[in-house]
């Protein structure tokens, strides 16, 4: 299996720290609002990657945090006349509801920054003791220039970093920092109503970057296999995480850095973001469309590539999903009919080849486009085979299992629960079959209309009548 490593800018053979196990840390949301489609891209992309690792037999330890204290949290809490704690609780609950609807597997652990304050303070103090951090008026900064490879992840040199920092730093920070490229590890409390904790440097709160360094190393160890997040986190967030973590532990922080592409919108394909006011929240969009359609659509583009969010794209995803659903229904119908089985070596060879090609595609840095193309072709092969008078039922059982497993990698699961009126529907189907047998077309049409009024779709096939709910 090959994974594109942002740090080296190339695909590398994936070799986990422990055979058969994968440690993954993915930066989670800052919980001051509902997540938008752009935020969901990262959640969906890394859930798909996690599911594929599990499909390949790996045991995945997946940690994804909640940033429940920072400037955005404080400002939003003031605006809504509530506390940071209550704001966080509300939007963590909303996040879990939205991601459950999108069939995202819960992380092994969802740590929260505010629950790790002691560990954060200890981490910062360790960096001060090592001489790579310093305190000024209750704020603590990291000496970025002390870290030899600072800028490597985002492919920037010190001169570029200095120029960028000089443009964004305010006068107060400039007077405190030894160097414009230094960044905050701990922020002093500015106002009485601001959330804060006691520390050796006075009341304050953690900086954003230190939170993830502490939570990832606490729960996954000093070195982890994979650290993921959106491309916008490469700098400064992930760059700073590397500097902090490696300065503290003296060990390589992450073996494979993975970053997902943006969601864009409109003809100009602008990045979806709250700052541009061009975003759609998952909470709102799920009132209008099937969560499974959104999930499949967002999974259909290789994780590093941008995806342009559009209604046409969603409709196309819905059409493809219906095709897979119908294929699985037709498979069930043929597996349950009374016709004898007929061995088909051609179909068996097709299944073996399709599985090998699917794995080859996904092993190549999770190339979902190629993998989905193989899935689509397999569905075509199966639908053609299902038209035959006699089918290879053992091969079809294998095909059904394969297709279901592949769809589950993309978070798709077609589970039709038996309704209370299924027995009634079966009786009406039997009555209609009898009417057709007796060539009583008027009664047959009447029963079809009655079934349609109940939301039942009927298919008349050479193997008998099939039905499903619309």
From Swiss-Prot:
The keyword Signal does not apply. Signal peptide: none annotated. Gene3D superfamilies: Cysteine-tRNA ligase, C-terminal anti-codon recognition domain, HUPs. Its cofactor is Zn(2+). SMART domains: DALR_2 (SM00840). Its main location: cytoplasm. A motif ('HIGH' region) lies at residues 29-39. Pfam families: CysS_C (PF23493), DALR_2 (PF09190), tRNA-synt_1e (PF01406). It catalyses: tRNA(Cys) + L-cysteine + ATP = L-cysteinyl-tRNA(Cys) + AMP + diphosphate. Monomer. NCBIfam families: cysS (TIGR00435). This is Cysteine--tRNA ligase.
């Amino acid at each position: 299996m090959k994974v594109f490593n942002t740090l080296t800018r190339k695909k590398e053979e994936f070799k986990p720290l422990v055979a058969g196990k994968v440690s993954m840390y993915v930066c989670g949301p800052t919980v001051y609002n509902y997540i938008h489609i752009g935020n969901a891209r990262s959640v969906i992309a890394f859930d798909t990657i996690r599911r594929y690792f599990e499909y390949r037999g790996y045991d995945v330890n997946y940690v994804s945090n909640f940033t429940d204290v920072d400037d955005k949290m404080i400002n939003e809490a003031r605006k809504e006349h509530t506390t940071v704690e209550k704001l966080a609780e509300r939007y963590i609950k909303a996040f879990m509801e939205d991601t459950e609807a999108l069939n995202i597997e819960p992380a092994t652990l969802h740590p929260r920054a505010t629950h790790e304050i002691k560990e954060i303070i200890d981490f910062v103090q360790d960096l001060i003791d090592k001489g790579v951090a310093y305190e000024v008026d209750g704020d603590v900064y990291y000496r970025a220039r002390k870290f030899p490879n600072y800028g490597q992840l985002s492919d920037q040199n010190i001169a570029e970093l200095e120029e960028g920092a000089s443009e964004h730093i305010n006068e107060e920070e400039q007077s405190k920092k030894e160097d414009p490229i230094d960044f905050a590890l701990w922020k002093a409390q500015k106002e009485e109503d601001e959330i804060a904790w006691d520390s050796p440097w006075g009341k304050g709160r953690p900086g954003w970057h230190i939170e993830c360094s502490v939570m990832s190393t606490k729960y996954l160890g000093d070195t982890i296999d994979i650290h993921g997040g959106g491309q916008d986190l490469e700098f400064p967030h992930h760059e700073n995480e590397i500097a902090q973590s490696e300065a503290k532990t003296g060990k390589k922080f992450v073996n494979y850095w993975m970053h997902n592409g943006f969601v864009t919108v409109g003809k100009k394909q602008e990045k979806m973001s709250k700052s541009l006011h061009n975003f759609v929240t998952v909470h709102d969009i799920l009132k209008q469309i099937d969560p499974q359609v959104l999930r499949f659509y967002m999974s259909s583009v290789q994780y590093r590539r941008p995806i342009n969010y559009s209604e046409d794209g969603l409709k196309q995803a819905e059409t493809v999903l219906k095709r897979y659903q119908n294929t699985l229904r037709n498979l069930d119908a043929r597996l349950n009919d009374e016709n004898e089985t007929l061995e088909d070596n051609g179909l068996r060879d097709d299944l073996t080849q399709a599985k090998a090609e699917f794995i080859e595609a996904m092993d190549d840095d999770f190339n979902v486009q190629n993998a989905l193309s193989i899935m689509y072709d397999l569905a075509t092969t199966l639908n053609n085979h299902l038209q035959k008078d006699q089918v290879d039922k053992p091969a079809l059982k294998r095909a059904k299992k394969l297709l279901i497993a592949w769809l589950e990698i993309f978070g798709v699961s077609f589970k039709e629960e038996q309704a209370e009126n299924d027995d009634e529907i079966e009786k009406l189907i039997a009555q209609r079959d009898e009417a057709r047998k007796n060539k009583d077309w008027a009664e047959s049409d009447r029963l079809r209309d009655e079934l349609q009024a109940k939301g039942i779709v009927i298919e008349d096939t050479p193997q008998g009548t099939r039905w499903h709910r619309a």
